[in-house]
Amino acid sequence: MKVVEVKHPLVRHKIGLMREGDISTKRFRELAAEVGSLLTYEATADFETETVTIEGWNGPVEVDQIKGKKVTVVPILRAGLGMMDGVLEHIPSARISVVGIYRDEETLEPVPYFEKLASDMNERIALIVDPMLATGGSMIATIDLLKKRGCTSIKALVLVAAPEGIKALEAAHPDVELYTAAIDRCLNEKGYILPGLGDAGDKIFGTK
């Protein structure tokens, strides 16, 4: 599985700011979108382009345009919504496919509760966004769902990943690509990433 830890200075700086324990909801939300935007830039670097001729201000001009499959952004509810605008900033025409999954706090297993996917998933590149890759359960369940709908090109964008989650994701779906702003140390006994960001969903939405 292709794993890319984006080490650009801006990404490292912004993730560092997100780790502050007393960060405000407004600031955390802004940074989640900003880092999501930077991850999108990295994840789309291999998109193919084609040269087309358009009518410019002074006559015909050749320009490059992205070709191939169209994109669908797949936020995993609810926290994934915090990264979605960062993706749409670069790909405003992308379709939005929503997957609702929560983690059972007792078993740490993913529990699906909602889905609304683009009707032509087999023709699209899916960019899944979720702030945390902890155990990997929610991400694996989401990819299972997308593949059942015919999607064959999938990239996952996360703010922070745990080694345990990366290992689980690779075992389940070695054909996907993972882009993360940071690979952290480990999970604690409750399945939270250390040092992590805390509960990203609570911090993005300001609710518990």
From Swiss-Prot:
Gene3D superfamilies: 3.40.50.2020
Extent of the signal sequence: none
Transmembrane stretches, start-end: none
Molecular function as annotated in GO: GTP binding; magnesium ion binding; uracil phosphoribosyltransferase activity
Annotated binding of 5-phospho-alpha-D-ribose 1-diphosphate, by residue: 78, 103, 130-138, 199
Keyword list, A-Z: Allosteric enzyme, Glycosyltransferase, GTP-binding, Magnesium, Nucleotide-binding, Transferase
Activity: how regulated: Allosterically activated by GTP.
The EC number(s) this enzyme carries: 2.4.2.9
Pathway(s) this gene product operates in, as recorded in its UniProt entry: Pyrimidine metabolism; UMP biosynthesis via salvage pathway; UMP from uracil: step 1/1
Reactions listed under catalytic activity: UMP + diphosphate = 5-phospho-alpha-D-ribose 1-diphosphate + uracil
InterPro entries, per database record: PRibTrfase_dom, PRTase-like, Upp_B, UPRTase/APRTase, Ura_phspho_trans
Disulfide feature: none
Positions that bind uracil: 193, 198-200
Cofactor(s) the protein requires to work: Mg(2+)
Free-text comment on the cofactor: Binds 1 Mg(2+) ion per subunit. The magnesium is bound as Mg-PRPP.
Enzyme's top EC category: transferase
GO biological process terms, semicolon-separated: UMP salvage; uracil salvage
CDD domains, sorted: PRTases_typeI
Entry annotated with the keyword Signal: no
Function text: Catalyzes the conversion of uracil and 5-phospho-alpha-D-ribose 1-diphosphate (PRPP) to UMP and diphosphate.
Family to which the UniProt record says this protein belongs: Belongs to the UPRTase family.
Listed name of the protein: Uracil phosphoribosyltransferase
Organism: Shewanella sp. (strain ANA-3)
Taxon lineage: Bacteria, Pseudomonadati, Pseudomonadota, Gammaproteobacteria, Alteromonadales
